[in-house]
Structure formats: structure tokens, C-alpha cells
């Protein structure tokens, strides 16, 4: 797995870039959000990446932040959304804007992204609800919560302990942001026993 690249930016042709890392050029597709934040060609750059291996190709996708990559990983888990469509969504809106649209069940905003119709937008709301966390607090809409990966791990542990998915998700809502999985499970169990 190629998780991160640090090297010299040698080509920029939207949506693709090439990064030279010790003499090896890595081509990656990037969202337009990432593309516009890249330095000029010839300068050093760091990119968080996701490698997708298909029968006919190895595709590398690059992101300016780990949060954008995490959002991409959640998007490609949604039925009907492939890697290129997920990249298009992240080109149309930031990870925080996407999290806000999902939290507000804003199907109209979600379906404004390229390749996303009303039914896919509704599926996104259904499948991503509670999995995306906005990090920039806007209008007090988002309460602090553990990062999406930690939340999934905490919920998974509670499910393994025999709690229903509804109970597990409700218990995780009271766990503060930045809490590791072990402490998060302890706090969630405490919430369940109240």
C-alpha cells in the first residue's frame, strides 16, 4: 500500500499530477480541491494517497490532507460510487462541506456533484450518516465526536459485546473528540449503563 508520497512535483495536468520520489515518478489523480492547493511545478510536495488495484489497472489517488483521504475511503464504500465519482464529489465540495450536507440530509446539495443523482445522494445520506465528521465547526451544527475510524471501531466493539447497532451508535455520541478506541469503548459502555 502506498499511503503517502513526499517528493518533487514534476507535472500538473488536471486532474493528474506526477511526483518524483527519488527518481521514480508516481502519477496520481487528485481532486480539484487538492490540485488548486499544490505548489508550483519543481517544488517539494507531500500527498496522502490511496492505491486502488483493479484487474486492469493500479490507480493512485492523492489528497492534500489525511481527512480528505479518509472521506474518499468512506465514499467508495457507498454502493454506486466508484473512485472516479468519489474524486468528483471531493472536487465539487470539501470534506467538511460533504459532512455537513450528509448531516443535514441535503440531497439537493449532494446531487449537485458530478455523477450523483437523487437516488445516489439519498443512498449517501443513508450510508454515510454518522461516519463523516466535520472538523471546521460552522454555525454550531457539529458536536465534537471521535474521528470516523475510531467511531467505527468503538461501534464494532459494542456490537461484538451484544449491543444493537442503534444502542451502540447512541452511546458513541457521548464520546469526546480525539478519544482512542479503548477509552472510547469504556466511555460508551458507561453511557449505556446510565
Curated annotation (Swiss-Prot):
Disulphide-bridged cysteine pairs:
none
Q: What GO molecular-function term can you cite, just one?
A: four-way junction DNA binding
Q: Where in the cell is it found?
A: Cytoplasm
From the UniProt entry, list the residue stretches annotated as the region Domain II. Answer: 65-143
Tell me which UniProt keywords the record has, alphabetically.
Cytoplasm, DNA damage, DNA recombination, DNA repair, DNA-binding
Q: Which segments carry the region annotation Domain III?
A: 147-194
Q: Which InterPro entries match?
A: DNA_helicase_Holl-junc_RuvA_I, Hlx-hairpin-Hlx_DNA-bd_motif, NA-bd_OB-fold, RuvA, RuvA_2-like, RuvA_C, RuvA_C_sf
Question: One Pfam family of this protein, by short name?
Answer: RuvA_N
Region annotated Domain I sits at 1-64
Q: Indicate the segments annotated as coiled coil, or none if absent.
A: none
Quote the protein name from its UniProt record.
Answer: Holliday junction branch migration complex subunit RuvA
Q: Which organism is it from?
A: Neisseria meningitidis serogroup A / serotype 4A (strain DSM 15465 / Z2491)
Q: What is the lineage of its organism?
A: Bacteria, Pseudomonadati, Pseudomonadota, Betaproteobacteria, Neisseriales
Amino acid at each position: 500500500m502506498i499511503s503517502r508520497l513526499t517528493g518533487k512535483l514534476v507535472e500538473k495536468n488536471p486532474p493528474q499530477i506526477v511526483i518524483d520520489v527519488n527518481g521514480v515518478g508516481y502519477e496520481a489523480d487528485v481532486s480539484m480541491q487538492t490540485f488548486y492547493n499544490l505548489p508550483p511545478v519543481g517544488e517539494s510536495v507531500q500527498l496522502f494517497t490511496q492505491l486502488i488495484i483493479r484487474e486492469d489497472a493500479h490507480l493512485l489517488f492523492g489528497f492534500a490532507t489525511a481527512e480528505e483521504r479518509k472521506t474518499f475511503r468512506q465514499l467508495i464504500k457507498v454502493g454506486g460510487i466508484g473512485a472516479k465519482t468519489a474524486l468528483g464529489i471531493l472536487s465539487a465540495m470539501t470534506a467538511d462541506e460533504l459532512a455537513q450536507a450528509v448531516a443535514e440530509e441535503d440531497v439537493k446539495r449532494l446531487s449537485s456533484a458530478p455523477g450523483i443523482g437523487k437516488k445516489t445522494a439519498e443512498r449517501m445520506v443513508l450510508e454515510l450518516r454518522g461516519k463523516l465528521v466535520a472538523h471546521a465547526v460552522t454555525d454550531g451544527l457539529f458536536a465534537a465526536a471521535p474521528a470516523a475510524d475510531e467511531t467505527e471501531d468503538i461501534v464494532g466493539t459494542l456490537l461484538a459485546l451484544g449491543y444493537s447497532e442503534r444502542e451502540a451508535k447512541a452511546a458513541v455520541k457521548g464520546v469526546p473528540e480525539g478519544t482512542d478506541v479503548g477509552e472510547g469503548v469504556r466511555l460508551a459502555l458507561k453511557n449505556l449503563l446510565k
